[in-house]
Amino acid sequence: MVHGSSDSATLESIEQVHDDGRICIWSPHGTGRGITVMIDNYDSFTFNVAQLLVEEGANVVIFRNDKVSIETLESLRPVNMVISPGPGHPLTDAGISLACIKHFGGQIPILGICMGLQCVTVAFGGVVSGAGEIFHGKTSMMQHDGCGLFAGLSTSVPITGTRYHSLCAQIDAVPDVLRETAHVDSGVVMGLRHKTYTIEAVQYHPESVMSEYGHEMVRNFLSWRGGTWAENPHVLNTPASAGPSTSESILTRIFRQRKLDVAQSQT
C-alpha cells in the first residue's frame, strides 16, 4: 500500500509498505543515486532519522533487524547504510546490525546512530558498557574534530546534541581501527570513525530538534562515495579552527542557552 506523508508541508514523500515488512520512503528530492538501507533496531526514533535522510534527498528502505538477510540487502545494491538507534545492548539486541557492518564495511558508507555507534564499536572488537550517567532526552555540549560527519563545522565552538542512552563505547577499549571524533566534558565518547572505511557513528541523536547541525551532518554522509576514505580524500582534511563561522552572535548564544533551559525544565 502507498501512503502520502502526514506532513506534506515539510515532506511530500511516498511510503510503500511491502509484504516482507520492508518500508520504502522515496524522497521528492531524490538524487537518483540509489537506495539508502536503514536497519531498524526496533526504535521509536527510526522514522525521525528516516525523515531527515529523505529531506536531504535519500531514498530509504527500512528493514527490522531480524526480518532481513545479508543476501536480500545485497540484492538491493544500496549506496549506503544507516544503523538506527535502539534499546538494549548491541551484542544481544541488534539483530543483523553487526553482520551488516562487518559485511558492508569497506564497500559502502555506513552511519551509526546511538545504538548504531555501539554496534560499530563491538563489530570491530570494542567494549560497550555503562556510561556512568543516564540520559533520556537531555542535551549536552560536545567537542568534535571538524571532519567526516562534522565537516564544515567549526571546532572552536561546541555543538549541542540530544542524548538517549545509558551505555557507551569504553574509550580505553576502542579498537585501533577506530578513532574518537567527538566527546562530552565527562569523557563519554560521542563519535567514532573507522580509520580506513567510510564508517562513522555518533552516540547522540542528530535528528532531534534539540540537536544542532543534523541536516549538515546527514548531507555530509550522503555525499560520500565508495567504502573507503581514500575514495573521499577531501572528507578528512584538517579543518580550520578559525574563520567567520567560529564566532557566535549574541542571538545564537541566547538561543543555545534557551534550548538548554528548556531541556533541563523537562527533566
Across the structure, where does each feature detected by a protein language model lie?
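Cysteine-nucleophile active-site neighborhood
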Residues: 33-35, 75-160, 218-220
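A short, flexible N-terminal coil/short beta segment enriched in small residues
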Residues: 9-41
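Short, charged N-terminal beta->alpha structural module
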Residues: 32, 36-56
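Short hydrophobic/Thr-rich beta-strand motif most characteristic of the beta2 strand and flanking loop
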Residues: 59-65
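Short acidic active-site motifs
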Residues: 67-72
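Acyltransferase
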Residues: 2-17, 209-267
